[in-house]
Curated annotation (Swiss-Prot):
Function summary: Binds the 23S rRNA.
SUPFAM superfamilies: L28p-like (SSF143800)
Gene Ontology cellular component list: ribonucleoprotein complex; ribosome
Native source species: Thermotoga sp. (strain RQ2)
A molecular function (GO) term: metal ion binding
Name this polypeptide is given: Large ribosomal subunit protein bL31
Keyword rRNA-binding: yes
């Protein structure tokens, strides 16, 4: 590898909207994500059909106010 042409890798803590933190090596300083493996429905349902909804912007509540719970 040539010296001086590669970006510097640093250990960064990635924060999810659910509060979970993951640590990665990356060239980016700050990373925030909306969904991770601790809160994504694919990983959290456990095959039992349960669904966990992560709504950081209130879209679900807006939909329920507009159409009600019997959509």
């Amino acid at each position: 590898m040539k010296k001086g042409i590669h970006p510097e890798m640093k250990l960064v803590t990635v924060k999810c909207a659910c509060g979970a933190e993951h640590t990665f090596y990356t060239t980016v300083d700050n990373i925030r994500i909306d969904v991770c493996s601790k809160c994504h429905p694919f990983y959290t349902s456990g095959g039992k059909g349960g669904v966990l909804i992560v709504d950081t912007e209130g879209r679900v509540e807006k939909f329920r106010r507009k159409y009600g719970d019997n959509y």
